[in-house]
Amino acid sequence: MKKILLTLFVAFFAFLTYAAAAYQPHFSTAGFFEIAGTGRNAYSMNPAWRMYKGHVDGAENVSFDDSSWKLTSLPDGIEKLPMEASGCVNYQGEVWYRKHFNADAAWKGQRLVLYFEAIMGKSKVWVNGKLMKQHFGGFLPVIVDVSNILKYGEDNVITVMADNGDDPSYPPGKAQDVLDFTYAGGIYRDCWLIKTNKVFITDANEENHIAGGGVFVSYGKVSEELSEINIKTMLKNIAGSNFKGSLVYELQDANRTVVWSKNLKTSISRQKSTTLSTKAAIKDVQLWTPDHPYLYRLNIYVKNQQDKIVDGYYIRIGIRSLEFKAGDGFWLNGKPYPEPLIGANRHQDFAIVGNALSNSLHWRDAKKLKDTGLRVIRNAHYPQDPAFMDACDELGLFVIENTPGWQFWNPEPSFANYVYNDIRNIVRRDRNRPSVWLWEPILNETWYPDDFAKKVKGIVHEEYPYPYCYTACDATAKGSEYYNIQFTHPLSGDPTWALSSDKVDPKKNYFTREWGDNVDDWNSHNSPSRASRSWGEYPMLVQAKGYGKPDYQYTCYDALFRTTRQHVGGCLWHSFDHQRGYHPDPFYGGIMDNFRQPKYSYYMFMSQRPNQKNPSLIADSGPMVYIANAMTPFSPADVTIYSNCDSVTLTYNKGGKVYTYAKAKNRVGMPSPIITFKDVFHMMDDKELSRQKKQSDSYLLAQGYVDGKLVATHQVKPTRRPSRIKLWVDNEGTSLHADGSDMVTVVAAIADDQGNIKRLNNEHILFSIEGEGRIVGDQESFSNPVEVKWGTAPVLIQSTTTAGKIKVKASVVWQGKTTPVDGYIELESVKPEYPLIGNEREMNAIPQNGVRMCLQGNTNMQSSKEKLKEVEKQQADFE
């Protein structure tokens, strides 16, 4: 009966998780969103690749036997690594990939392009034995036209060699053992096959035209009453005859109502291209802001003389203007931005898989950060995955776009040329995104030549020669005089790093690119900001206080709200825990761990968001209250609470004392100070209630009020005897797609009968699975079984290429009569958004990693409990 009730509880919990959020994100492919019936199709090339780690001779040849190579799906990061994987434990060197697939005979005569979103390091791509592309750099697209090399109706082979080994000849250039992040490796982002007709809209990265290629959307005057949009599109005709037709635009609002359209006549000679420009004047405009990230849909069609669509797709645009006024800070859409912009840096590193995140994991990263009220992300230290950028566009996160680089310069001219090329391709890839706030073309913390900063700023403006384009540079770096936005600390923050008042330029504006980290020295890296979640309450409380308002002067949330308008905000270092090359310790300073499990500081950040619900946001918003005290025998007597409410009450135990806090109305500094109620919790009070059989009377209850109304509550209870494992899916309401690549985190927790999580527990959880999913990682990477840390044990689940149900079971590794009862949860994958291309036999043969489910588990708990009641009585009698 106990097991049945547990299963029903978990099933109900899972239902709530999936039902909570109706919104399902959609992701761009090669910079566009597909429209059916246009002749343009995107196919996922992610499934069924063969992979070999190391050098191998002859693997580019069609006849090479790869049957012994490991089967994998993209994104692939070469290997699965444990949560603690710093100090260069990851593989560096060559890795080879091969993919077999049948090219549909119906594709013959059309244009087909392989589009790799990124391949780490230096790479080569062969198709059917012919070298088609060499590429240097691990963060930008690799594009290969395969139209004339494919064998239609037959088997084809793509071979990729990727080498993530140390190489100073191209950026970042820094050897990994002296690098503050890791390169990871492999084909770690998506690969697409794009099919079009021979008259088509070009791709800006493929064409390599300054401020050209593809579609370029820019803006003139912007206001709610009337906004000017400039649209430029490059078309190409590779057919054997001339083309006459039209280029058609439709701008749709969020309700899919057409608010503007345009038909431009065009003629293109064979083997030629043309660029058409037009302007649109839009009335009654919904402007894009971080708190109102309104996206219009721009449909683009190419039609022939018979009015038949021969190419087309849509992109999402947000209409907004950016301005940094001399000494007066940031202005958005013609109005001064009302408060400092607070954000965080983001590496793409995730537990177990490294950089090889699925699109949904990228989206959930952005969603979790936006839930805290952050408004800007710095892409440290390279351009991020397009899926993450898609998320920033629709969730309302400004982005500082970084050039790949970190504390390294190579004086060889070729190195600088690679940097310049990266900058151009970053702008071309992301120039239409409303989320892009600043371009950071300089190399992070690097002593580059005197002319470099001026040169790269010029390149950005060559590629974006329109209004609302801004670049930023460190205030103390060479060439900073050319930049109107400079990175530094505020005078209210870290005095060591801040510009002295006599050096502050009244014509400039300032921003803190990295704040919060506080190491003793740059060798030991001991820091009160670096608190592993597994270390528990006190370190997490110290971290949160340091980020909010420490007892010493330092750049923190509070300090950034004590600046003039000239200092426009700052980004925390760092949002998530991540691996590093040059230090054996991971970076523990994230507000979440590398599985994106929150620390106390996450809720401190969340308490700074506005307390009014915002219906314009997909992300969470509105009032919140959180008790940062677990009521363990070791929990502090002082109770810390994070809340954005006007007032908060804290009730200690049923019928007990009620404590009250009211936020001062005319305060300065952070929007919501950390609340501390002194000398509240004592374990002996809980003991007394427990001995009276009044365990349910022992609790902390926080209630938040806005305008006198109760709007938020949070209750914490002491955890009793661990009796079961409970599970939940950490998916932010998104579906799991059966594309062989998508991943979702399932979290197991040791809990008591009431579902309270046993934070102080050292169990190991073994996950097993059945159905259309596989566990990512294994015992070798400490991914399964998983050690319980601060009460929880997470695991990554990956979909297969077949939609269906997935059942996950969690058990303690060593089971006995009184160990916690197994937990179960069921989820279901849905059909993929795009057709999958690959050898079907190999797609189905990808190993089902992890333990396949055995339904026999620990079912003895109920009978054991009856015996234990007698033991409990005997102990009480003899005490």
State where each predicted segment sits.
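Extended acidic/polar, glycine-enriched regions
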Residues: K151-D155, K232-K325, T802, L827
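Short, hydrophobic beta-strand segments
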Residues: V146, T278-L287, I675-Q695, N784-T801
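Substrate-binding clefts and catalytic carboxylate motifs of secreted carbohydrate-active enzymes
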Residues: N41-E60, E79, I119, L179, ...
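Accessory carbohydrate-binding/adhesion or oligomerization-edge regions at the termini
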Residues: L16-P82, M161, G165-Y170, G186-Y188, ...
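Substrate-binding/catalytic cleft of secreted carbohydrate-active enzymes
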Residues: W363-K368, V376-S601, F605, G622-A628, ...
